[in-house]
Amino acid sequence: MEPRKLSETTPEDYARLGMKSGLEIHQQLATRKKLFCRCPVIRPYSEEYDAEILRHMRPTLSELGEYDGTALMEFKTKKEIVYQIRQETVCTYEMDDTPPFELNEEALDIALEITMLLGCNLVSEVHIARKQYLDGSIPTGFQRTTILGVDGSIPYKGRRIGIRQLGLEEDACREVSDVGHLRTYRTDRLGFALIESVTYPDMRTPQEVAEVAQLLRRLARSTGKVHTGIGAGRQDVNVSIEGGRRVEIKGVSRIPLIPLLVHNEAFRQAALLEIKAELERRGVTAASFRADASNVTELVAGTQYYPLAKALRDGLEARAVVLRGFRGILSWRTQPETTFAKEISDRVRVIACLNRIPNIAHSDQEGETLSSTEWTRIKKAARAGDRDTIVLVWGDRRDVETGAGEIALRARDALDGVPNETRQALPDGTNGFERILPGPDRMYPDTDLPPIAITEDRIERIRSIMAERP
């Protein structure tokens, strides 16, 4: 289906795409203390801090002895993580120097109230699990989380939207900056009690997704026991179309942004499936796929293309990756004002930490680029044919090696259509690569805290003061 504007797309168009969407709504609870320690919850946040701590993150094996793909991806970035800490808002628990305190009972009561408002079946015992986070947003490398209820629903326009589960977990740090191999966080909101309401993929149009998000937000606010304001509530949106895969758009801060984000993601997936079909038509398969990399620094030493020329003046190197059979593919439109080349550039930016844009050039691109003579010279040296595309990447030797590998991996993923990814919501309604979508191997039991029984007395006490559920 040809891409079109949101305002020109009908529910029937989304039905033809087979679009489905679900939500993960995160909402801070208005507790006095944090979830697993007794540090105060202070809002609004402060920009002041008393000290900095440096950490490096490394993946650990899951309960089944396997590594999570997202954790391995984050480890590949070789990031140094700096935490800006304020004595008033953190303790040794957040820095992973002491075990957790008992679960905050006030937070548990509020979370159970919202779980019942969503009509979920309550668990009989609370079991804490650990969810790996190797991006550094939690100093321990994992988030403590628990499920409180499953299989609920809320009414919406004559039907019901299913609630898969509601969980209670600790909030992560606030990111300050992410440049090269250095990522900086502030720890003031770290450990805040947070609920995560997860719906089934029951929404069929972008507008429905936004309206259901609004319903869930209003329901949580009806308790009067949640924080409001910037950063207190965040939405993750899951989108898939027929033939595609679930893609998570992470951290949507404003509900009005949701329709355009969902619309663009649906048509991005349609474009990726068209690319897959075109590669199949050309006979490019997993068995025949080739991506050959070579150092071409000397071949482009005199280039006038400014981004590359500056890198070479700084003593960096250039590497060319030949994608066999990919001619024209990188110029294929995937989102408004965006082509498949950005799918590759994003991977290089995030994983190889080459975040000075542009970080790649390719032989099919129009506008400012290398001269035709330089491209011909590279093609000849790399033995590229008329059906091939060359992607050039430049930077520090170690990062360029990683970048060349990511170019090949993302091109290989094109043969499968839509990769499972977590993607970042951008202000213009498009999205960009953030990380590989996590799998079940990121979860494992927490051994520091015992189970907590959810008694009938507790349920009745909460039910006696809660609002009537929809």
What are these regions (language model features)?
Residues M1-M466:
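Basic, nucleic-acid-interacting segments
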